[in-house]
């Protein structure tokens, strides 16, 4: 533990790490012209025949700081990113600080159940899964044995298919999430969650 001179902050651990992850795939029937398998992008008529692809852009680096202050108690600061941005540039995946069961920053959304997601080779993940990240302020209550309750306020992000008449507008309110989870061992749990959100859009009607 390294304490800063003249302050009440004690740094217990800090480090930088990461991993290299590479995948290879062979498409026998020209399903999708993308390194990720996105079912919505499958064309009605195949445009591509056999093709081989490799990708290492999901390699990840992270920075982590663990410490203690009288005001915040034990705290953790964590940032991580990979190279899935445009043209394989760096893309932020997590950037948050947690203390006294409060999390502030950019991390996994409160409506998703991260522990229920299966491991997949494809970076896109399982089809139909609820997976997203959001800038948020969240609180987790752990005062009851085997139970965990969480509530969060999140920055809204709406993604959808648009057209010349339909556009996604600026959102007017944050998203609100809440969840309750019961665990009876290290690998089994039941979780109930809900979300309140407003999705604002504009629609231009053409009169003939």
What would you call each of these model-derived segments?
Residues 1-6, 11, 206-207:
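Single conserved hydrophobic/aromatic residue that forms the stacking wall/gate
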Residues 13-36, 44-158, 172-187:
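Outer membrane beta-barrel
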Residues 162-205:
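Surface-exposed beta-loop-beta
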Residues 4, 16, 191:
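Short glycine/serine/threonine-biased micro-segments
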